[in-house]
Amino acid sequence: MKTVTVKDLVIGAGAPKIIVSLMAKDIARVKSEALAYREADFDILEWRVDHFADLSNVESVMAAAKILRETMPEKPLLFTFRSAKEGGEQAISTEAYIALNRAAIDSGLVDMIDLELFTGDDQVKETVAYAHAHDVKVVMSNHDFHKTPEAEEIIARLRKMQSFDADIPKIALMPQSTSDVLTLLTATLEMQEQYADRPIITMSMAKTGVISRLAGEVFGSAATFGAVKKASAPGQISVNDLRTVLTILHQA
């Protein structure tokens, strides 16, 4: 299993890493939330850019990114515009989505970008290559806030991300039952044991899926999302509680 190192953080070794999402809508809130987040116990800062109101002004977006970089210089920064179709706050064209991610890559301010698998194969491949040429890692993602597909389909999506040279494939699915959570965990384990040559991130959402956010080290998920303040997805738990449980499982 190949690990991914961002700054001094080795993803894919040891206990799952904790990612927190910052979802401020303007520069003033980016600044105040960044200061509040600075004291929290987490590993990776995800900036959910789809919550930022002034998206059309690239300078404003990058000014906000600069604040995050300067406030928490030691934390890996993951730049994420979550599309409306995958649970995000805003809908933008594919062209605008790619341009925004390329601007983030060009800025030199971000360590990783999130790229949605179903953006379009050619655009995804080109953007991965562009990111890698600028030493930016790619978390390739897929989210379904309605259902959990069969294990074979989950594995197929993760393998497709891997074939597109994602540094970290990621999938988040909504369970309709406890057995859906088992499906996600089964797929994670099979992917990790049989196909993955890099870290993967998987989760089953909502209260039903909470176990998947805690048991990554057992089944093969390299990171998990926690909440500093407001959860960015159903089922997230506080970073302090999360770290406690991850440490217990790691040391057992």
From Swiss-Prot:
Keyword Kinase included in the entry's annotation: no
PROSITE patterns reported in the protein's UniProt record: DEHYDROQUINASE_I
Leader peptide range in chain numbering: none
SUPFAM superfamilies for the chain: Aldolase
Residues involved in 3-dehydroquinate binding: 21, 46-48, 82, 213, 232, 236
Keywords (A to Z) from UniProt: Amino-acid biosynthesis, Aromatic amino acid biosynthesis, Lyase, Schiff base
Function (record text): Involved in the third step of the chorismate pathway, which leads to the biosynthesis of aromatic amino acids. Catalyzes the cis-dehydration of 3-dehydroquinate (DHQ) and introduces the first double bond of the aromatic ring to yield 3-dehydroshikimate.
Family recorded in the similarity comment: Belongs to the type-I 3-dehydroquinase family.
Transmembrane regions: none
Annotated pathway: Metabolic intermediate biosynthesis; chorismate biosynthesis; chorismate from D-erythrose 4-phosphate and phosphoenolpyruvate: step 3/7
Substrates-to-products reaction catalysed: 3-dehydroquinate = 3-dehydroshikimate + H2O
NCBIfam families: aroD
GO process terms (BP): 3,4-dihydroxybenzoate biosynthetic process; amino acid biosynthetic process; aromatic amino acid family biosynthetic process; chorismate biosynthetic process
Any GO molecular function: 3-dehydroquinate dehydratase activity
Organism for this UniProt entry: Shigella sonnei (strain Ss046)
Name the record gives this protein: 3-dehydroquinate dehydratase
EC number: 4.2.1.10
Subunit structure: Homodimer.
Active-site residue list: 143, 170
